[in-house]
């Protein structure tokens, strides 16, 4: 199994990418080859300065780089020798089994759609992120790939998310909910009102209706659908609230000797809460619907986030996620045809 890693993508590249890749190679590298893509001199200089052993890796030199300010479409079309575009091209050509990048979400989405393509039945891949819930974790999509969506796309996300929840997460009859500013059918923008009706009429999913943002984290729904703008806001707001809340609790427990002693009694529980809310534990979000595994790591990922994104890529390949998705979507399409007949 060969996994490509974009060494130049993300706010903390290449150092944190190299550190994360090194940890991945050490912890679960058996049967896996990691290939780093990026400016070879920068990679080697960084590794030397930080005493990182590059022996476990192959390095593919790239002379260009796509940054967060580049126009995604122009960057993918014109920066052919960037680590992101070269990685996706190698993946398409069968030179690797998966690609991991913490780089530009827009460029990765455009590049995946234009280069790697999508499985049959999917027009636009969506970023799907497992999120922690009070009762159980749930899948949130889209988390940033498609900022503007037509109602039909939101309906397709519901189908894709339902398939993923059933086939990968092991959920039986997964509940699908649509993020909205109210539970009533008439709430939301025209796009969301129409999407609600499409999801409600979709014979291939179990639609639970609209869900208000304050109830998302309850974990009642297995799949939560929204456009990429809303999903990215939900994702980053959740991360920010968790970080702030944990910081506030820490200040409270450090006030005096009594609060410090109280902290010792619940230290384990707080540690588990912190782990649950840590985005780096998940590592990255698969571009659901891509023809081959493409994992988007958080742009601010540190070593642990990169390591876990690589772990997720390995699991996707081992479990044939893309093949399973295509097969399941074929079954869904057949069910729809039967229902329409």
Regions picked out by a protein language model, each given a short descriptive name:
Residues 13-17, 43, 81-94, 98-112, ...:
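Short glycine/serine/threonine-rich phosphate/pyrophosphate-binding segments
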Residues 1-5, 11-15, 29-31, 44-45, ...:
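N-terminal charge/polar-biased segments
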Residues 113-126, 130-140, 220-224, 228-338:
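Glycine-rich phosphate/nucleotide-binding loop
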Residues 51-96:
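Phosphate/nucleotide-donor binding subsite
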Residues 6, 37-38, 60, 101-103, ...:
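Short beta-strand segments
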Residues 15-16, 28-35, 41-44, 50, ...:
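Glycine-rich phosphate/diphosphate-binding loop of Rossmann-like nucleotide-binding domains
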Residues 5-15, 145-155, 296-302:
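Short, glycine-rich nucleotide/cofactor-binding loops
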